[in-house]
Amino acid sequence: MNRLAVELPGLSLKNPIMPASGCFGFGREYARFYDLSVLGAIMIKATTKEPRFGNPTPRVAETPGGMLNAIGLQNPGLDKVLEEELPWLEQFDVPIIANIAGSTVEEYVEVAEAISKAPNVHALELNISCPNVKKGGIAFGTVPDVAAELTRLVKEVAAVPVYVNVSPNVTDIVAMAKAIEQAGADGLTMINTLVGMRIDVKTGRPILANGTGGLSGPAVKPIAIRMIYEVSQAVSIPIIGMGGIQTAEDVLEFFYAGASAVAVGTANFVDPFVCPTIIADLPALLDDLGIGHISECIGRSWKTGAHAVHCRA
């Protein structure tokens, strides 16, 4: 028995570990270090209809507990992804989750319809939570009705299950998640980055050319866990959790909160081997805790009832 295997809509995962979109490109750089087939899945970089060159530099800044980025959805565009990147990934025994973005509803729908037909794309991740673009992205992800309508329209044309990336930059993430579920989403991915800023004390100006950027890394982990803990009790669709994961112990925290799989983001920049290391470490951790299968951990923190909370301070 594979103790790490996970079944999600459209995804039969050999293990629940995958690199998060935007932190792994299309896998080419990391394939020089290890066989990508060891991964549970790969969330490829966000794809838009036309190529995007992203925001001006500097667009990355370190913080004490992570990093800020304002990349701006830089990508080669739909045609190149379909003609070059996805065919290259076919050599690996790993399902692909295609992250899609756009400036308009029509762009999202067009990209979703086309990319979901690729033979190795098993699911879509609808990016409505990127805080670093002037059009699209988070503009679709902060109003429940807008997010729900976009989800519904993408579901109508997608040939594979649709997961929606939920923004933490909202007043009520539970209301947002429920609206997306009711619109037909097959799953959620959460959380994306939190909007932040750093200022250069010598110039008095923001370090990032964009001014603000998305905060990721260990600093956001407690926020991600709290949000997943709340949302997982309010919806019935699975959650792929992300936000500051670096170790096998982190993975179990996310599972206990209610995630059914996880994505590792910023840690890939620190250690390119972080994903295979976590995969290798998980069985021993399960042994130490007397857990037979990783699925036994899902929602353990609130299913016991001892610590369930349903309100915010």
UniProtKB/Swiss-Prot annotation:
Binds 1 FMN per subunit. Pfam families: DHO_dh. Transmembrane segments: none annotated. FMN binds at residues 21, 45-46, 99, 127, 191, 217, 243-244, 265-266. Pathway: Pyrimidine metabolism; UMP biosynthesis via de novo pathway; orotate from (S)-dihydroorotate (NAD(+) route): step 1/1. PANTHER family: DIHYDROOROTATE DEHYDROGENASE (FUMARATE) (PTHR48109:SF1), DIHYDROOROTATE DEHYDROGENASE (QUINONE), MITOCHONDRIAL-RELATED (PTHR48109). Belongs to the dihydroorotate dehydrogenase family. Type 1 subfamily. This is Dihydroorotate dehydrogenase B (NAD(+)), catalytic subunit. It comes from Bacillus caldolyticus.
